[in-house]
Amino acid sequence: MLFDRTFHPDEANQAFTTGRLLETGSYTYQPQDHHGPTLYYAAAALQRSAGNASTAALDGTLLRCTPLVFAVIAIILGAAALKRITGRLTPGAILAALLGTVPMFAFFATDFIQETLLVCFLMMMFWAGAGYLRPGPKWKTGTWALMFGTASGLAFATKETCLLSFAAAAMAALPFLARRGAIDKIRERVCARDAIMVTGGFALTAVILYSDFGRNFQGVYNAFIAAPLSYLHRGVGDATTSTGANWHVHPWWWYASILFGGKSIYSLAAIALAALAAVCALMRGAGRATRFVFLYAFALFAIHSILPYKTPWCMLPVVSALALAAALGIADVMGRKRHLYILAALSAIIVCDTQLTACVQMGRNPDATDIPYNYAAASPEVKELAAIVASAMSSATNHEPLTTNHKPLTTNHAPPFIAVALPAADTWPFPWYNRQWEPNTGYWTSFDDLKRLAETGIKPTVVIVPMEEGHLVQPLFPHLKHTKRFYMRPRIPARNVRGVRVRVFW
């Protein structure tokens, strides 16, 4: 089951942010290496409904249910948009089958990250846009405009990369705007009130969420000014303002290799979906909506490919748009010649079957390193490491908790406690699996901190250090008799990934 896979370091970091929100009741937006608050607010509400009120009490499965709920809502909104465009329910059912079996969508729908929520709010924008463009009374167009603005505000309050989606949509609209008389039709259709509704809905939603419901307006400045600059640096791979941005710098063709050039069971599914979307969009008689969505997916793929900073989950809006274009295209041929209808149905069945096979394969071994979406993941061995730490801590006699983390200890803090001295990026997701003992854990980034700790005479119950510094621990803490080696990040020779290895002493 995908729910059973090891927490990704990013998931663990997001989980701790959710835990802090539960414990303090407030959220402070940080523009460097963090994203908007919608995921945290939604997850916190779900955790509270289950009676969980602290980081230690967080339920991992429930956390991963949060994006899954929004994945289902995204499919429903997409189907509703197709119903408004085509007037039929069948295209929505096709979208549900296509999108519900996309391997990448299935994988990241249970990942505690922002991308699934972003797709949901982008689908909400598409639904509201479809409602606005459909002829109707003026009061209804104002309502649709407000919904569109609110959805765009929610997308912006989810992840800053929504701006790339907005840019791609604008690029996709250019061929339609270039047609004779298109601008005049827009002037007749769009009124100042609707523009105010869109702008107001966007601004009000974004300000409310980024300001933590009016309690911290510094978050608004960070979201609109500081964050775009930070993520511009990150997008080009500049690590001076974004931790580890250079680790994710890849060549322009990297996304194509992830989607179409990996293990056949995954690449065939992606190729089949992309081919179906392309054929449907380019065939004679394709609707404007089909062509717009396909052009949007192509433009978004191109933008992400040009930017040096790349991670697989950034492709989720692209594959979602491909599924939408394919469903619209199949709807276009329905009602025409019977052989086209049969061909479209067979194409959809083949694509769904190929994708479903890939999803089943992922579910059998969700931690497999040959899954192309298992990127920068943690090793399953981190669970065994956490189990050893918990056992050592439970067997200790003194359970006095520390009063602070991440600071040098004093002799007033008695064992048991855990001393972790690892580079910050290599520490995660251990804090997630160690959350029960977080009050009794000190995190440092240098072995020199352990030397100063030893000089105070304090004897930690557990010490975790990088593999290459393991031989220095027992001379400092001779009372630690047991040791074992673990991979925090897996070694993947096929990708030239050396992995991250640590040693634990207890």
Predicted regions and their residues:
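Transmembrane-helix motifs of polytopic, lipid-linked glycan transferases
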Residues: 65-86, 124
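Juxtamembrane segments of multi-pass membrane glycosylation machinery
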Residues: 23-24, 42-69, 88
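Transmembrane-helix signature of polytopic, membrane-embedded enzymes
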Residues: 57, 78-101, 137-139
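Specific aromatic-rich, kink-prone transmembrane helix
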Residues: 77, 117-136, 148-152, 321-325
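Membrane-interface transmembrane helices that cradle and orient dolichyl/undecaprenyl
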Residues: 84-86, 125-145, 155, 174, ...
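Transmembrane-lumen/periplasm boundary regions of multi-pass, lipid-linked membrane glycan transferases
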Residues: 13-24, 35, 41, 49-52, ...
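Short acidic/glycine- and proline-prone juxtamembrane loop motifs at membrane-interface regions
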Residues: 8-9, 60, 104-117, 161, ...
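Short periplasmic/luminal acceptor-recognition loop of GT-C membrane glycosyltransferases, typified by
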Residues: 382-399, 412-447, 461-467
